[in-house]
Design a protein with these regions (language model features):
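Bacterial N-terminal signal peptides
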Residues: 9-20
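Extracellular/lumenal mature domains of secreted and surface-exposed proteins
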Residues: 23-138
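N-terminal secretory signal peptides that target proteins for export/translocation
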Residues: 1-6
Length: 138
């Protein structure tokens, strides 16, 4: 009897493998979009065409992946910039009028490793300083 069971074992094992259903693909979890966040320095004074402003988006996050790119729109007519680094420096373009504050909406869009995106914006107040030797702003 023992010999008969030994001869059947491979057949039963094969039968169990064939009868047991295979693993089915589970539906992929939906992508959770990233959250954009940034700070900048200096906040004031920002002199148009002169002051380098440092932007830092390290506070941005993606709960189910990684942030693949940071896209910055400056609001001052200069081309947007895309980078893989969360930090960047920008000098705002000269304004059309001297001694007047101009408010630009800076927009950050972060894109995650699955193509999801999130955005945040802040206002930057920029002033065109007077020409050297001319009257000072009042």
């Amino acid at each position: 009897m023992r010999r008969g069971i030994r001869n059947l074992s491979p057949l039963l094992l094969l039968l169990l493998v064939v009868v047991t259903p295979g693993c089915e693909d589970l539906p992929a979890a939906p992508n959770i979009p990233p959250t954009a966040s940034f700070i900048f320095n200096p906040v004031s004074p920002i002199n148009a065409g002169e002051t380098p402003v440092s932007f830092n988006a390290v506070g941005s996050s993606d709960p189910d992946g990684t942030i693949a790119s940071y896209v910055w729109s400056w609001g001052d007519g200069t081309p947007e910039q895309s980078t893989t680094s969360p930090t960047i420096t920008h000098v705002f373009a000269d304004t059309p009028v001297r001694c007047v504050n101009v408010v630009y909406a800076v927009l950050l869009t972060v894109i995650d490793n699955e193509g999801g995106n999130g955005s945040a914006s802040q206002q930057a107040t920029v002033t065109e300083v007077p020409i050297a030797g001319s009257a000072q702003c009042k």
